[in-house]
Each structure stands twice: as structure tokens, then as C-alpha cells.
Swiss-Prot record:
Name the UniProt record assigns to this protein: Protein-methionine-sulfoxide reductase catalytic subunit MsrP
Free-text description of this protein's post-translational modifications in UniProt: Predicted to be exported by the Tat system. The position of the signal peptide cleavage has not been experimentally proven.
Cofactor(s) named in the record: Mo-molybdopterin
UniProt cross-references to InterPro entries, sorted A to Z: MsrP, OxRdtase_Mopterin-bd_dom, OxRdtase_Mopterin-bd_sf, TAT_signal
Binding, Mo-molybdopterin: 90, 93-94, 148, 183, 231, 236, 247-249
Source species taxonomy: Bacteria, Pseudomonadati, Pseudomonadota, Betaproteobacteria, Burkholderiales
Superkingdom field: Bacteria
Keyword Transferase: no
Oxidoreductase recorded as keyword: yes
Transmembrane spans: none
Length: 331
């Protein structure tokens, strides 16, 4: 593939800039959430879903606010990454290969109206518009670690609901063994599609038990507001014990299939990107050690890297799914 040399250069891995902005205090973020929730309660008729729907129709910052209660089961005893870093340091190749490209170029994405087709081995296939999807289950905030295969990480306060809630409603058949996620591929909205980096559209997949795991989050917000375009608006999946590329963005199709689906990076380089791609400090990528990581906005070039945790620190939730598997073979 002609793009390989360029792509490898783009993935050099040590292009992490120092942040000049102090991360927002966690208490300040909580205060905003509580204020938004209080305003919604005072209104009587306006809840989290109403706020979200208004936000997609308006570029106004206040309208983009999204109230959701914090789930105390899902917190991280570490500093939350700043909103600036979360929204300006991204991998979203549909908008370019530089980390700053999504923030600069994703304004062309139109997140509303939006439809997600749920299809395949299910008894109740359905096409959800984003408004209906937002009303499917109660929203909550979860603070998760995000670990990129390139050796950097963040701590991010996502808003969404368990993917399992959607799965239960569509009733998978006994033939459904895997779930595939397909991202929008519209050249008029995504200028990066002109580069033959991957076989578009971008797709990812999970085993059914992984998709049903309580950690797997169908995500529509971050940092107390609806997802910015560069972070995968209007809906993405977050799988916190896997490397970031497994968490598909701007989803338009969710397919239930009977066999392991092709996924974009695994198809591109199966010896480098496994289907499972669980965070594992004992299995290195050919170009990046996975034993340690640099926290964006917090760990400078001269700060010792922090040790990477097995399953990104979520072993109590997920390790049993891989009992007996050779995780070096099934990486």
C-alpha cells in the first residue's frame, strides 16, 4: 500500500507536546454538572435528554451542556485530563493523520440529524435516530482511563449508558457471536477519506461477552457536554480495557454477526494490531513498548513514564473473559 511509509511516519509515537494549560479541577467539573442538573430539575420538564437534543441543534456553548449523574463505581484516583487536551490531541484519521487535524478540520461533520442502523443477527433490527438513541437509557458520567497503543494515555469523564442496554432491546439471536461497529464514511464531511490510509469505512468489533460487559459504554458526551465532533460525535463506543482504536467513533451501523468481523487496523497490519487489542504491558507493539505510558498534559518529556496496568487497570471487571487464553497469541 503506497500510504504505508507516510502512515508509519505519522505514527512516530513521540510527538506528544507539553501542555501549557493546567487541567481543569475535578471539583469545578462536578460543580458544572450539578448546576446543570439543578437547572434541569428546576425546569421540571427539561432533563438530560432534552439538553442533549438541544445541544446537537445549536453551536452555543451553553446549549452543548449535558447533565448526567456521576456513577461512583467508575472513577479513577488520578487527575482528569484537561478539556483542551482531550479535544485537541486526537487520532481520527477521517480528518487527517496529525493529532491536531481533527480539532481543526472536524467542523465539517454534521452530527444532527444522525441515524444508527442496528442490524444482523437480532430479532428486533431497528434504525435509531440520535434523538431516540439518547432516550434509550438513563445517562451517567464515568471517568475512565484511555490508553493509546502509541504509548500515551488520558483520564476522561465520558457520558453515556451501557451498550448492554441497547443489546437487550434488539434481542440478539443465538447466532450472534460478535458485534461490529461501522463509522461514517462521507468524503463531503470527512476530508481525510481522500487518503487511502485504511479501507474505509472504519470498522471495529467485539466478542458478544465483551460488548455486554458493564464497562462497555455507548457514549454521547464528555466533560459535561455532548461529544465534540473531533471526539466522535454524536455517538461512539468506549471500551476502556482495550487500546483506544477499538473505541469506534461516529457510529452509523452496529451489526450482530456469527463470526469474527474484519476490523480496520487488524486488516491493515494483523501482525501489529490484534483483534482483541487488550491493554497488556507484557506484549509490545513492534514500534512501541506497552510496558509504560506518558499521560498527556501531565507527564513531560523528562518525567519518568508511568507503568501501564494490565487491562488498563480494569482486570477485576474483565480478566475472567480471557481465562485460559494465550494473550500473547490472541493479542
Amino acid at each position: 500500500m503506497l500510504i504505508k511509509k507516510t502512515l508509519r511516519a505519522a505514527l512516530a509515537g513521540d510527538d506528544i507536546p507539553r501542555s501549557e494549560i493546567t487541567p481543569r479541577a475535578v471539583f469545578e467539573h462536578r460543580r458544572r454538572i450539578l448546576q446543570a442538573a439543578g437547572a434541569a430539575a428546576a425546569g421540571g420538564l427539561v432533563g438530560a435528554h432534552g439538553l442533549a437534543l438541544a445541544a446537537y441543534a445549536s453551536p452555543d456553548a451553553a446549549a452543548r451542556k449535558l447533565a448526567a449523574p456521576a456513577n461512583p463505581k467508575f472513577v479513577v484516583p488520578e487527575k482528569v485530563t484537561s478539556f483542551k487536551d482531550i479535544t485537541t490531541y486526537n487520532n481520527f484519521y477521517e480528518f487527517g493523520t496529525d493529532k491536531s487535524d481533527p480539532a481543526r478540520r472536524a467542523g465539517t461533520l454534521r452530527p444532527h440529524p444522525w441515524r444508527v442502523s442496528v442490524e444482523g443477527e437480532v430479532r428486533n433490527p431497528k434504525v435509531y435516530d440520535i434523538d431516540a438513541l439518547l432516550k434509550l437509557a438513563p445517562l451517567e458520567e464515568r471517568v475512565y482511563r484511555l490508553r493509546c497503543v502509541e504509548g500515551w494515555s488520558m483520564v476522561i469523564p465520558w457520558i453515556g449508558f451501557p451498550l448492554a442496554e441497547l443489546i437487550k432491546r434488539v434481542e440478539p439471536t443465538a447466532n450472534a457471536k460478535y458485534v461490529q461497529f461501522v463509522t461514517l464514511a462521507d468524503p463531503s464531511q470527512m476530508p481525510g477519506l481522500s487518503a487511502p490510509i485504511l479501507d474505509w469505512p472504519y470498522s471495529e468489533g467485539l466478542r458478544m461477552d465483551e460488548a455486554m460487559n458493564p464497562l462497555t459504554l455507548l457514549t454521547i458526551g464528555v466533560y459535561g457536554q455532548v461529544l465534540p465532533n473531533q471526539n466522535g460525535a454524536p455517538v461512539r463506543v468506549i471500551v476502556p480495557w482495550k487500546y483506544g482504536f477499538k473505541s469506534a467513533k461516529s457510529i452509523v451501523k452496529i451489526r450482530f454477526v456469527d463470526r469474527q468481523p474484519p476490523t480496520s487496523w487488524n486488516t491493515y497490519a494483523p501482525n501489529e494490531y490484534g483483534f482483541y487489542s487488550n491493554v497488556n504491558p507484557n506484549v509490545d507493539h513492534p514500534r512501541w513498548s506497552q510496558a509504560t505510558e506518558r499521560r498527556i498534559g501531565e507527564d513531560g518529556f523528562f518525567t519518568p513514564k508511568r507503568k501501564t496496568l494490565m487491562f488498563n487497570g480494569y482486570g477485576d471487571w474483565v480478566a475472567s473473559m480471557y481465562r485460559g487464553m494465550d494473550l500473547k497469541k490472541y493479542f
